[in-house]
Every structure is written in structure tokens, then in C-alpha cells.
Regions:
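A glycine-rich, aromatic-flanked flexible loop/lid motif
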Residues: 1, 32-42, 162, 216-221, ...
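Non-heme iron-sulfur electron-transfer modules
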Residues: 134-138, 172-212, 234-263, 587
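Structured core elements
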Residues: 32-34, 43-45, 78, 112-113, ...
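Iron-sulfur cluster-binding electron-transfer modules in prokaryotic oxidoreductases
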Residues: 237-619
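Ferredoxin-like iron-sulfur electron-transfer modules
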Residues: 137-161, 197-223
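Iron-sulfur cluster-binding cysteine motifs and their immediate structural context
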Residues: 160, 164-194, 220-247, 434-437, ...
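Extended hydrophobic-aromatic, low-complexity segments
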Residues: 45, 53-57, 168-170, 177-180, ...
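Conserved glycine-rich FAD pyrophosphate-binding loop
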Residues: 1-158, 176-178, 184, 246
Length: 619
């Protein structure tokens, strides 16, 4: 009995001294002076752990003592953030009566903040939200999605509410009452996830209204990651949106059943079905443009979807695999292969191979021109980003595993052939984002992931090219949501690219900010959101096309883009503006400088004269 007591009692000590000291130190109330830089405002601030109910009560008592002391010394109640909760009980009767009279005069129906500032007693006790308490409660629960909920809450709880994300977020459009920047969404998300938790605990399922509101948050994000560069605490809001999308899909609340079924059908046989679907889309767009020509404009104006609201940009019918006959060989070299020849594994993706094969052709031609051998997957591979953006994480993981295995096999074969494979290159920001998740550099440490323009621009510095524009004019460049330059912060990537273009071609490259309004399939699946973004982009394009004050000349050059999806989006904007400007990917524009306007047909002819394991194409 004694031995049992000796082992049982120490484990049940009531309150060790060191634990008491730690708690007292952590819950000690500190009355701090909080000063605003610039305006001279200095006021009291009481830091509180919102998950400690006892500390909250002590803080309220302390605030009451401070307010009482201030009023005894002749101080007044001010309202920097409002007087409605903490300070209302200290507001004098005369001032409250004056406020009541003022509200009755300007707001007789009591619409704005009803019953605010006119009653000292609060109708309910205010609730202070606590991320930590909610995380602990969810962790102790048995909810199936608790890991996702905890991950989301842990990510957004460090938000400082500074609002620096507003400056770069495409979804911040105050003129149209669009305030979906991460600062606002982080605050709303915490409250919604708390409601999701209690809904699951009480009902066993998430309320449909909550799912609808969560979906609204997710739809208002392109997952570009620009906000991460501005965020002082580095909250990956793009990843938060993707995680939320996955959570919604698991609840069958993604909101786009047709899109989901189409992606499920495509992902079962990517190499065969996706090229066929791209051909159908190209052919369908041509037919639709003709049919819409006879539809009355009054009807088209009523349509929200850009598919039915007007003509759309044309897309290529012949894909890269057919243009270069990659079944004859998918490795190209500028000269006879020697051991250690630099080689680039080029991943064209859907945009550079199916919708616009000229982007893929330009990429291969430029890489060959700069002395690199180029390897292209002989069959179509999709990076899977549409699956990730749709919340289909299981299908995305399966597709990524297949791609990783296939690309790793290609890399091993290239190394056996004597190539020095230095880069995995793309010409699309979302492709590069998705490929980075494969982590091929863990198997091949020497492999760097870069944009094709990032590889070729430094090597073209000595070419002495001149841009085909009149002296003194600018080249307009649309900055894509996803950064075009790897290895640098998102906001600096565009400056790096435009700076390299200016240095190479001796022209001024002017950036037109703002989302193009396409965002992959976003323009079709969420037209109410992306129509607003497209309208803002059209305004900025129209301003760029205005006559110059000095010469009176209008801009007549191309619009450069760094993303295949943006090529579609900007072309759609120009169609609606009735402006005729070529929309060129940066690689297309560079290839024109290197080999002329007719370079596409000549390069295809030279390439198709070769076959074999390594096809020698001199550029």
C-alpha cells in the first residue's frame, strides 16, 4: 500500500511552485503607454492573452481603475477605435444625451449602429475571440478535418492587421466595393472557422451558409502570392486559399460541379484527353465567334460569362507535339553533342504546347540559340495546377507523382547521354509553382528551376538587338499574377524581367498593373468577380493607349505578357476595347528579334528535317 501511495501521490501534486510562478508571470497585467508615430497620439494599452478568461477579467478591472483615475484628474473619454464597449460606462451623461439628440436628428430610423452610444448598459456581454483557445478546442476534438482547421488558424492568427497586402492584392478594388485583401479575409476567416467548429460539434456537419461564405472568400483569390512579399509576418495567403478550397471540395461544396467533372475526366488520361480537349476548345472558339456575330448586342450585354458576352481570343489548333513531330525525337541540340553540353529540360505545359504552340517553339529556339540542348517531354504532361486550384488535392497528388516519376526518368537518361542538365524551365508562372512542389532538386541537387526568359536574357546581352518600335516610345508589359522570375521575391521578379528587357533591347518597358481578369478558368467559373477585374484592366489599358502629350501619337506596339493565360486575358480585354494590338509572350517577342517575324515556319522546317535520339537544329 505504501509503495502504491509513493508512486501515486507525486503524480497528483496540486500546484508546483515553478508552475505558479510561470502562470503569474504570463498573466501579469501590464499597463503600457502606446504611442502612434507621426500624429502624437499616446494612450493606454493593456496586452492580454485572450485565451485566459481570468486575465481578461483582471484586465477589465484594471481598465476601469485607469479610466477612473484619468477622469478624477480631469481627463475625457476619447474614441480612437470607438467607445461602444470598453469606454461607454465612463462616458458622461451630458455627452451621451448630446449624442442621442444628434443621432435622432441625422438618423431618425436608427439604421446606423442601432442603440450604439446611447445606453450605458450593454445588452450582452462582449465576447473576445481567441485563436489559441479555439485551436486547443479543435485539437481535443475528433473532427475529421481538424488538422486542416488547425493549420488554417495557426497560419492566419499572426496577422498584424497592418494592411500592407492591400497595395498588391488584385482583389482590393475599393471603387467597386471589393475589399477581399488578406487583412480583411484573415479576420473573417477566424470567425468563420470558429463557427465551422461549433457547427460540426453541434450538428455533425458544416452549415451550408458557412460553406457558402467560405467559398466566397476562396473565390476572391488568385493564389499569386504577391501579398507574401509585402507581409511583415509572411502569411502565405495563397496557400490558405488552396487549403480552404480543398476543405470545401471534401465537403462537396466547391460550387463548380461541371468544372469538377471535366477535370476528373481529363486527369484520368492526361496525355491523350487534354490535347483533344484543347483542340475542341480551339475549334469551339472559332465557331462561337462566328455565331456570336449574329446575336443581338442587347442579348450579349446581359450575359455575365465572357464566353457568351462577346467574341473570344483565338487559340492554336496544332500543338507543339505535332509541330515538331516529337515522336521522332524530343531532344534538340544546337551542334554535335559533346560530354558536358549544357541542357535544359523544358516543360511547356498546356499553354505553351496546346493553346499556343508558338510559345513553346520560341522557347526551344531561344534556348538552342544560346547554346543549350533542349529536352521536351515527348507526350503531354500537365503541371496539375488547375487541380490544385480546384481543391482536388488527391487527384493533384496522383498527377504530381506521375509527373515526378516521368521527369526523373528523363533526367537520368539525359545524364547518361552526357548532358549537363542544369535547368528545369517553364514559360508559365503557375506551371513553375506546381513543378516546385515536386521537389525534383532533392533527387537532382544541381537542377535549378527557372523561367526560360530568365535563362536566355543574360546570354542575349551581346546580341545588340533593337526593338521594332520608334525611338522614344515604350513597350507595354502586363505583369502576371504569378511571378515570371524565379528565385526572387514576387514583387521584384517583374522589375527584374522588365529591367533585363530594357537593357537588352534599349527601350523603355512600361508595366501595366492589375489582373487581366482571366486567372485560368476563373473568368468562366466566377464571372461576377473577374468581370470587375477585367473592367479595371481595360481602364488601365485605355489610359496607356491615349495619345502622348509630346507627340500626340498613340501606342501601336505589342502588349507583352509572361503567362499563356494572361495572353488570353489581355486579348479578351483588347477585343472588348476594340483595339488591335498583338499580344505576345515575352519569348515570342524575343524570338522575333533573334530570327525575324517568319522564324516560326523556318524553325519548324529545320527541326522537321531531323530525327533521332538527339536532333541537331542549328539556330
Amino acid at each position: 500500500m505504501l509503495s502504491i501511495a509513493v508512486t501515486w501521490l507525486p503524480d497528483r501534486k496540486v500546484c508546483p511552485w515553478h508552475s505558479t510562478c510561470d502562470y503569474m508571470e504570463a498573466s501579469r497585467i501590464v499597463v503600457a503607454s502606446h504611442m502612434h508615430a507621426g500624429d502624437g497620439n499616446c494612450h493606454v494599452n493593456i496586452p492580454v492573452n485572450s485565451n485566459d478568461a481570468h486575465m481578461l477579467e483582471e484586465a477589465e478591472e484594471t481598465a476601469a481603475r485607469v479610466m477612473a483615475e484619468c477622469q478624477e484628474m480631469g481627463g475625457e473619454v476619447s474614441g480612437e477605435h470607438g467607445i461602444g464597449i470598453t469606454k461607454i460606462s465612463f462616458l458622461g451623461k451630458s455627452k451621451m444625451d448630446a449624442l442621442r439628440a444628434f443621432k435622432e436628428r441625422v438618423d431618425p430610423r436608427d439604421v446606423m449602429n442601432p442603440a450604439k452610444l446611447v445606453h450605458r448598459e450593454l445588452p450582452v456581454r462582449p465576447f473576445t475571440f481567441s485563436f489559441n483557445r479555439l485551436i486547443n478546442d479543435i485539437h481535443a476534438s475528433g473532427l475529421p478535418d481538424k488538422e486542416k482547421l488547425i493549420s488554417l488558424l495557426s497560419t492566419v492568427q499572426v496577422c498584424t492587421r497592418c494592411g500592407k497586402c492591400k497595395q498588391v492584392c488584385s482583389m482590393c478594388y475599393p471603387e467597386r466595393s471589393m475589399q477581399y485583401h488578406p487583412r480583411n479575409k484573415n479576420m473573417v476567416l477566424g470567425m468563420l472557422l470558429e463557427a465551422v467548429y461549433y457547427s460540426q460539434v453541434n450538428k455533425g456537419a458544416i452549415d451550408d451558409n458557412l460553406l457558402r461564405w467560405l467559398r466566397d472568400l476562396v473565390e476572391h483569390c488568385t493564389a499569386c502570392g504577391r501579398c507574401l512579399a509585402n507581409c511583415p509576418v509572411k502569411i502565405p495567403s495563397g496557400e490558405v486559399a488552396l487549403t480552404l478550397r480543398s476543405l470545401l471540395e471534401h465537403e462537396n461544396a466547391g460550387g463548380h460541379p461541371i468544372k469538377k467533372r471535366a477535370l476528373e475526366w481529363l486527369v484520368h488520361d492526361v496525355s491523350s484527353r487534354v490535347p483533344k480537349a484543347a483542340k475542341m476548345a480551339s475549334l469551339g472558339q472559332k465557331v462561337q465567334n462566328k455565331l456570336l456575330g449574329v446575336v443581338p448586342s442587347v442579348w450579349k450585354k446581359r450575359m455575365q460569362s465572357p464566353i457568351f458576352a462577346g467574341s473570344g481570343p483565338k487559340m492554336g489548333y496544332t500543338n507543339l507535339y505535332e509541330s515538331l513531330r516529337l515522336h521522332r525525337g524530343s531532344v534538340f541540340a544546337p551542334r554535335e553533342v559533346t560530354p558536358g553540353m549544357p541542357c535544359v529540360l523544358y516543360f511547356p505545359g498546356c499553354g505553351g504546347s496546346l493553346f499556343y504552340d508558338r510559345i513553346g517553339l520560341a522557347a526551344i529556339m531561344l534556348l538552342l540559340h544560346t547554346g543549350h540542348a533542349v529536352a521536351v517531354p515527348p507526350r503531354h504532361l500537365c503541371c496539375g495546377y488547375p487541380l490544385l486550384a480546384a481543391g482536388m488535392d488527391t487527384e493533384y497528388e496522383d498527377n504530381m507523382a506521375q509527373n515526378r516519376q516521368y521527369l526523373a526518368s528523363m533526367l537520368r537518361n539525359l545524364i547518361k547521354q552526357g548532358f549537363d542538365v542544369r535547368y528545369l524551365a517553364t514559360a508559365c508562372g503557375s506551371c513553375r509553382d506546381s513543378l516546385a512542389r515536386m521537389k525534383l532538386n532533392e533527387q537532382f541537387p544541381q537542377l535549378e528551376q527557372k523561367d526560360v526568359s530568365q535563362i536566355v536574357l543574360p546570354l542575349l546581352q551581346h546580341e545588340g538587338m533593337e526593338a521594332p518600335v520608334a525611338p522614344g516610345t515604350n513597350v507595354l508589359y502586363h505583369a502576371a499574377c504569378h511571378c515570371e522570375w524565379a528565385g526572387v521575391p514576387t514583387l521584384k521578379g517583374q522589375a527584374q524581367l522588365t529591367g533585363a528587357l530594357e537593357q537588352l533591347c534599349k527601350v523603355k518597358v512600361s508595366t501595366i498593373p492589375g489582373c487581366c481578369g482571366e486567372s485560368g478558368m476563373g473568368a468562366v467559373t466566377s464571372p461576377t468577380i473577374y468581370n470587375l477585374l477585367r473592367a479595371r484592366k481595360k481602364e488601365r489599358l485605355a489610359q496607356a493607349f491615349e495619345p502622348q502629350p509630346q507627340t500626340g501619337a498613340c501606342y501601336a506596339g505589342p502588349i507583352l505578357v509572361g503567362c499563356p493565360s494572361c495572353k488570353i486575358g489581355i486579348a479578351r480585354c483588347l477585343i472588348q476595347l476594340k483595339e488591335k494590338h498583338p499580344v505576345l509572350h515575352v519569348l515570342e517577342w524575343l524570338a522575333n528579334q533573334v530570327d525575324g517575324e517568319d522564324r516560326r515556319q523556318r524553325f519548324r522546317r529545320r527541326a522537321n528535317e531531323t530525327r533521332g535520339d538527339v536532333r541537331i537544329v542549328q539556330c
